[in-house]
Design a protein with these regions (language model features):
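Short S/T/G/P-rich N-terminal loop/turn motif that feeds into the first structured element of a domain
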Residues: 1-49, 53-67, 74-89
Length: 89
């Protein structure tokens, strides 16, 4: 089932986010189950929204590619929401 993952990253800056995306971006684009990624600044830091084919695909990618590169003090708060619908072009 397609899931939406929202990552709230307190204390993250645009520079920190851009650096992380530079590290994991190619792997993300090729990851099994990956559908889309978007991000924006919030008052407390940064928010990332992703769509994945399954929660398992998302958590495996996070564990293998994101978590090993997180700087000290940066720990995203993840929430998962199964989607009722997804409309693609």
């Amino acid at each position: 089932m397609t899931v939406m993952i929202v990552s709230e990253v307190a204390g993250q800056s645009a520079q920190g986010y851009d650096g992380m995306l530079a590290i994991v971006g190619d792997a993300l684009r090729q990851a099994p189950g990956f559908i889309m990624h978007a991000s924006h600044r919030v008052d407390a830091g940064w928010r990332i929204v992703e769509l994945w084919a399954s929660r398992e695909d998302a958590t495996q990618f996070f564990a293998n590619h994101v978590a090993p590169h997180l700087p000290d003090g940066i720990r995203p708060k993840l929430s998962f929401q199964p989607l009722h619908s997804l409309v693609k072009p």
